[in-house]
């Protein structure tokens, strides 16, 4: 029950200290995000990667700071519960005119649950649902930018409007030929619109912040005409060197203004599917300067209605808010469904126990207590690998995960087979009890990773085999899968990631047909591996031996040995050798390793090469 009077002398001080802690967090988060513009302008790619990694750690650091302050100044953990009731009410009052209330509520939950005992994690003490609306939040300060800008082109001035639209972002680096690129965009927009009549409300709306990731900046907006809306994005890149030209860089890998090239609009992406791939859960988080993040999320959701708000917050780098919203969505789904959790279909992993709820598009992964001898690893090492992926550029090829502790599920929703599986392989991670004292038995998982469910690649291929490889549809499916598999590995190589275990079962197919890796317990940095050719046998005995007769170090990798594990099917082998035979050659890996060690940052495009203007409009510019 909430108190009728706010009579505690310390409750307001605790609430104020907590909101001060959040404001400090978001100020630092926003400052780091805004600096991405300068790093893009100066081609500081290594700085951009470093900032993306470090920003992920900001939230936990600020939560820890706030918790320490509350304990030191107010002995917060010793305060009675009626004081904590009042703290929450004061905190709600402080959020009335706040520009990030939903993030501040989540921050309150994080700090409170760090201080209070779990038995107090009830609706009265934390924000189970939002208390403050995020609708129509606006910054009324005269110097504040609106969330988005609107432009009203006509048939006659579309080209000039697009030039102004890009110039309004104020990039401090010259374009190679902005008028030419704006012409390409205008042509692409005209083709997309077709012969429709331009209505009275015809306009282009663009979010006022550029979206920065890796070596690109993205204009994100939508075209509105009558009752129709078309989402779009314009990738802006530094001009690439001509084939064979290598741009010199200093010791930090930063190219000079003249060397790195001028800016170009590289493509025009249209429609929800293109945007969903751009904002995919398998890519690194964007850096974008947002005063009112909920307004950005609302705008993006209007463009991608199939994308959960939780994943949009994740894509914007606000992973803790994404985690909060995901859990709320999960509880809502549980309340409105009746199916049971089960052991996930597919080949069981040696390190992870995986289960799912058929009606829910995610899987739950628990680290096992015991591993077979060939898996020389520990729980902490596995958690370290998942953290590495979280902080790394996932280049659209590694699934993002959400990490949770002490997650409670209704016992009646778990199949007995699943309970037996957890008791056998991960007993330390399982508790079955009435923890809340409400008479309902719960399954409590101590530590779990949650990620998007995909079709395992081995199952996808088996479906084609079962259909019959002589059938054109089956052969097309095999070709798409194998080509995408090789592309996925090469994209990961470009990001300095060696997957370790390259078996088909460790990759999945997304709804857009992309192949994504999701088994991280053996990943390594490419630069930490030693890629070798298998030595020439010394004699006939070596050649005929079924055992490895040569020395193998802990980080040694022999690419030519991948074939027997991957290419047992003739149809698969034919496609693989046609498109990706280089993956079986140690020289391929050594070459990429050397370039990464030399400071080169590869380009990985979140769209098809055929959509690039340099491809569509010929060799007029290097691209």
Curated annotation (Swiss-Prot):
Alphabetical list of InterPro entries matching this protein: AceK_kinase, AceK_regulatory, Isocitrate_DH_AceK
Enzyme Commission number(s) = 2.7.11.5, 3.1.3.-
Transmembrane stretches in the record are: none
Q: Which UniProt keywords apply?
A: ATP-binding, Cytoplasm, Glyoxylate bypass, Hydrolase, Kinase, Nucleotide-binding, Protein phosphatase, Serine/threonine-protein kinase, Transferase, Tricarboxylic acid cycle
Is Membrane one of the keywords? no
Q: Which residues bind ATP?
A: 344-350, 365
Q: What biological processes does GO assign it?
A: glucose metabolic process; glyoxylate cycle; tricarboxylic acid cycle
Q: What domain of life does the UniProt record list for this protein's source?
A: Bacteria
Q: Could you tell me what reaction this enzyme catalyses? A: L-seryl-[isocitrate dehydrogenase] + ATP = O-phospho-L-seryl-[isocitrate dehydrogenase] + ADP + H(+)
Q: Which residues form the active site?
A: 400
**Keyword Kinase appears in the UniProt entry:** yes
Location comes to: Cytoplasm
**Gene Ontology CC:** cytoplasm
MF terms in GO:
[isocitrate dehydrogenase (NADP+)] kinase activity; ATP binding; phosphoprotein phosphatase activity; protein serine/threonine kinase activity
List the HAMAP family hit by this protein, alphabetically. Answer: AceK
| PANTHER family according to UniProt | ISOCITRATE DEHYDROGENASE KINASE_PHOSPHATASE, PTHR39559
Q: What does this protein do?
A: Bifunctional enzyme which can phosphorylate or dephosphorylate isocitrate dehydrogenase (IDH) on a specific serine residue. This is a regulatory mechanism which enables bacteria to bypass the Krebs cycle via the glyoxylate shunt in response to the source of carbon. When bacteria are grown on glucose, IDH is fully active and unphosphorylated, but when grown on acetate or ethanol, the activity of IDH declines drastically concomitant with its phosphorylation.
The family note in this entry says: Belongs to the AceK family.
Name it.
Answer: Isocitrate dehydrogenase kinase/phosphatase
What organism does the record attribute this protein to? Polaromonas naphthalenivorans (strain CJ2)
The encoding gene = aceK
